[in-house]
């Protein structure tokens, strides 16, 4: 079986990225990911959500990109069942999962900047459906092992996604939180897109709270689309 048998990808994205899927680097990603999936190891997010970020936001609908690093590797208990926190969207978690510290800080800053009510759950899929691509640079992870799939090769694929979007859609609002995400600035054509940077929202990082990042995003969105982005959840 092929990757897309385990991890569905929408027709719009398959057409948009068609030439990538036969390249040696992608075939190697497919091989390594399927090997991990078939091993005794537990891989997050569940394979059906591997491309959830892409499936929720078609290429033609992308207006904002919020780039993450890799999926959450932890679990939570629901009805005595251990479930993955990761759901395939950067920074987002399953509806009933506890809200992680980074996401709590995102909600705090959003409230401080724009007065948006702090939601009771951490599912950001509503943002994705409104045109915010919540893409992780690395799309999978082994349970309880942060950055464990760094060597699978996902970053080559996510870089291609970004570069194709930068060519096709203009102007995009590209939000890069933290030093790892900000390395992607080199991929962004100058003077074509709006780049917004801030420290990573992790409590281990300093400077995110008070950065005004959501004010910057909203101002940029108004400039491009002449209306507000709806941040409500």
Curated annotation (Swiss-Prot):
GO terms for molecular function: uracil DNA N-glycosylase activity. InterPro entries: UDG_fam1 (IPR002043), Ura-DNA_Glyclase_AS (IPR018085), Uracil-DNA_glycosylase-like (IPR005122), Uracil-DNA_glycosylase-like_sf (IPR036895). The active site is at 70 (proton acceptor). It is found in: Cytoplasm. It holds the Pfam family UDG. SMART domains: UDG (SM00986), UreE_C (SM00987). Keywords: Cytoplasm, DNA damage, DNA repair, Hydrolase. Coiled coil: none annotated. Its EC number is 3.2.2.27. Belongs to the uracil-DNA glycosylase (UDG) superfamily. UNG family. This is Uracil-DNA glycosylase. It comes from Helicobacter pylori (strain HPAG1).
């Amino acid at each position: 079986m092929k990757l897309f048998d385990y991890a569905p990808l929408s027709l719009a994205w398959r057409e948009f990225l068609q030439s990538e899927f036969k390249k040696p680097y992608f075939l190697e990603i497919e091989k390594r990911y399927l090997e991990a999936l078939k091993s005794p190891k537990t891989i997050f997010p569940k394979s059906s959500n591997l491309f959830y970020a892409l499936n929720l936001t078609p290429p033609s609908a992308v207006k904002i990109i919020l780039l993450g690093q890799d999926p959450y590797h932890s679990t939570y208990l629901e009805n005595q069942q251990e479930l993955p926190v990761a759901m395939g969207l950067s920074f987002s978690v399953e509806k009933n999962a506890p809200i992680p510290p980074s996401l709590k800080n995102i909600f705090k800053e959003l409230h401080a900047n724009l007065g948006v009510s702090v939601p009771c759950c951490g599912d950001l899929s509503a943002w994705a459906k409104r045109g915010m691509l919540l893409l992780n640079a690395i799309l999978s992870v082994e349970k309880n092992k942060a950055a464990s799939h760094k060597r699978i090769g996902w970053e080559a694929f996510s870089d291609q996604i970004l570069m194709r979007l930068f060519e096709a859609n203009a102007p995009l609002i590209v939000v890069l939180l933290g030093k790892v995400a900000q390395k992607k600035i080199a991929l962004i054509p100058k003077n074509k897109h709006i780049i917004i940077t801030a420290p990573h929202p992790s409590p281990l990082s300093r400077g995110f709270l008070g950065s005004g990042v959501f004010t910057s995003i909203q101002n940029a969105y108004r400039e491009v689309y002449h209306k507000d982005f709806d941040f409500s959840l």
